[in-house]
Amino acid sequence: MQRKTVWCVGILLTCATLFSPQPSLSAPTPEPVPESQPITQPLRLEIRLKQRRVNVYQGDRKVKSYAIAVGKPGWETPIGNYTIKQKIRNPEWIHPLNGEKVPGGDPENPLGRYWIGFWTDGKNWIGFHGTPNPESVGTAASHGCIRMYNRDVEELFGKVSLGTEVVVKN
């Protein structure tokens, strides 16, 4: 009797597998729909000369603000609309009056370790950079450039791209 029971159970299991719905023949399983990714608006930099600040906007929302130094009398930072044209790590600095060069990476390099250029007349450049003189940030001290604390310009360097809009206002 045990043999017949085992044999019958075996046949029943075989039949059950043969007649059960196959995955390929059953209703399709719906694919998970990925969550939509937010559309990231490009950054825009707004330099406020009188406030000695650069504000970082994403769309209309201010996402960051940094203290800056601006051009001193006779070397004023030009007002206008620009775009970032250069990003350089460890830039070489060339003195605008005597042509003296200070190599990139030199602790005395007035540009610090990061350069973000947004204005040129074909010979001279103006841009964001660090400084070996952090006490100058918040003043009118540069030859037209935007000096920043080294940690701030490093952070900004990582956020912006070539073509990022730069607006300089009083």
Regions found by a protein language model. Name each.
Residues 2-8, 21-91, 105, 111-115:
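Cell wall/extracellular polymer interaction/catalysis modules
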Residues 9-19:
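Bacterial N-terminal signal peptides
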Residues 28-29, 36, 40, 72, ...:
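Exported/periplasmic cell-wall-interacting domains
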